[in-house]
Amino acid sequence: MMESTPALRASSRLIVALDVDSHAAASALVASLSPHVGWFKIGSVLFTREGPPVCALVKDSGARLFLDLKYHDIPNTVAGAVRNALALGADMITLHASGGPTMLRAARDAANEAGRGDVILVAVTVLTHLDEKEMNAVFGAKERVEDRVLALARVAREGGMTGVVASALELPAIKRAMGNDFVVVTPGIRLPDAKQDDQARVVTPEQAIKAGADYIVVGRPIIAAKDPAAAARGIVARMQ
């Protein structure tokens, strides 16, 4: 069972997004940052180009691997994808909550059958680049972002997920509705006065931790810094 959030060291709650497009760039970042952070996230850009070897790079560093490929397909296909992700050493995996509880349950069952019931399976709710207007256009509804996030969080729990990926702006409502044991991974983290880039719903590290985030995902504020290791240490300090 995962440690409760208060017991987790701040560095173990910081996930650095390897938002680069080559093994060489990822290798340099992992070498610089692995003494200071507990996790690295590999997304679709890096994985599509470099594949399994970049996962091995993270695992060989001693860090934990968040494979963020956001599976969304028929249950049998998703189950197979999860089995393959686990074979690569994934410690955390994303799936889209909108795939529904049957798809999500297939993922959980695949993990259990592989002897990896400990893997953190998190369902994506509403992507953090969407504001309310765009979200409603996508879903064909008229509702608040928070309401949609909560509905998808309930789908995630029904499907056996460990938790969800959600903005810290909706995080307190998720914790109230789902309980503190329901893990929330929060992307869209920016430092004060930084550009939002392509994110619409962003918060600082302090705001995310105060709101109850179990993990925060940070990309550009670390990997684009002049000194990524110093930037990571600074964010860890802000989380404490």
What are these regions (language model features)?
Residues P35, S61, L88, G159, ...:
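Structural motif
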Residues I15, G38-K41, F66, T94, ...:
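Conserved beta-strand positions in the central sheet of alpha/beta enzyme cores
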Residues V16, F40, K70, I93, ...:
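Conserved, mostly hydrophobic/aromatic
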Residues L88-P101, R190-P192, D198-A231:
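Glycine-rich phosphate-binding active-site loops on the catalytic face of alpha/beta enzymes
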Residues M1-L29, K59, L171-P172, R176-G179, ...:
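N-terminal amphipathic alpha-helix/helix-capping segment at the start of soluble metabolic enzymes
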Residues P52, L65, S167-V217:
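A C-terminal functional module that forms or caps the active site or interfaces directly
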Residues L8-S12, D73, T77-T162, S167-E170, ...:
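Conserved anion-binding
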Residues L104-A110, A114, I209, I222-Q240:
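C-terminal helical cap(s) of enzyme catalytic domains, especially alpha/beta-barrels
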